[in-house]
Regions:
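Switch/connector loops and helix/strand junctions flanking conserved nucleotide-binding motifs
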Residues: 54, 70-72, 107-111
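Active-site neighborhood for divalent-cation/phosphate handling
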Residues: 97, 101-180
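Conserved, well-folded catalytic cores of nucleic-acid-processing
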Residues: 50-51, 87-91, 134-138, 180
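Gly/Thr-rich phosphate-binding beta-strand-loop-beta motif of the actin/hexokinase/Hsp70
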Residues: 15-63, 96-103
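Residue-identity detector for glycine
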Residues: 6-8
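N-terminal phosphate-binding loop and adjacent alpha-helix
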Residues: 59-89
């Protein structure tokens, strides 16, 4: 997910709005910090595009206190938020946006077929309707995202859609830590 760093921030629902085929660093976009939250440290990286290559503009590693993150789950949001703040200061980044991933073990992914003729709004609505068949949690308790992967092999009338879902609490804890 992507979040505006600082007060009044809003989580953007679709990472794909940020990217071209490379993903998170489209030409002319505002800088974006990548934040990795492990059980021992917060790692921060800001890249920029130079032609067809990437350059490291800012980076930092900030240790976390013991048990702030346990088994990839944030236990102490304030401690993680403070570590992120220290890492941003140490790195010297002025970026206003950050992206952080939810641990793979906390994410459900499925490739689902969808009719190719659906426009973006209809596709989003259909994915939300179909998600209940693939997600073992109440749909109101998860954050969903999806990306069209391309045509279904052997059936050009259908597309393959990658559905990703995580319990909302997993996303909200990271969002809270980034907002501090």
């Amino acid at each position: 997910f992507v979040i505006n760093v600082g007060r009044g921030s809003t989580c953007l629902s679709r990472l794909s709005e940020w990217g071209d085929t490379v993903g998170l660093i489209p030409k002319g976009q505002s800088p974006l910090i990548g934040v990795d939250i492990s059980s021992t440290a917060v790692k921060l990286l800001q890249l920029s595009r130079v032609g067809n290559r990437f350059r490291v503009d800012h980076y930092a590693v900030e240790p976390l206190p013991p048990n702030a993150v346990v088994e990839k789950n944030i236990v102490e949001v304030e401690a993680v938020g403070e570590a992120i703040r220290r890492a941003v200061t140490r790195a010297g980044s002025k970026a206003k946006y950050a992206a952080a991933a939810v641990a793979g073990s906390a994410v459900i992914t499925k490739i689902i077929p969808m009719p190719a003729e659906l426009d973006d709004n209809d596709l989003e609505a259909q994915v939300e309707l179909e998600a209940v068949n693939y997600i073992p949690y109440p749909i109101e308790e998860v954050n969903l995202d999806f990306e069209v992967l391309g045509p279904m092999p052997g059936n050009p009338e259908m597309v393959q859609v990658l559905l990703a879902a995580s319990r909302s609490e997993n996303v909200e804890l990271r969002e809270s830590a980034l907002e501090l």
